[in-house]
């Protein structure tokens, strides 16, 4: 990983909620978790969670996928 990308990743993880989200996703493994489950586990409102997920995605730390019910 190059220095610039490392700084971007560490900056994203320096925020408490984003670090908690990242840890949950690492624990969940490759199948991940849906946003609703993450929000419920961390007691984070949907709009706030959406912002933090976008920040993690922009840093290249996660990817999103849509799954129908």
Q: Positions of the model-derived regions?
A:
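N-terminal helix-turn-helix DNA-binding core of bacterial DNA-binding proteins
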Residues: 4, 9-48, 69
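Beta-hairpin "wing" of winged helix-turn-helix
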Residues: 58-68
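Short, hydrophobic-biased segments on the C-terminal half of alpha helices
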Residues: 53-54
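Alpha-helical residues within the helix-turn-helix
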Residues: 40, 57-58
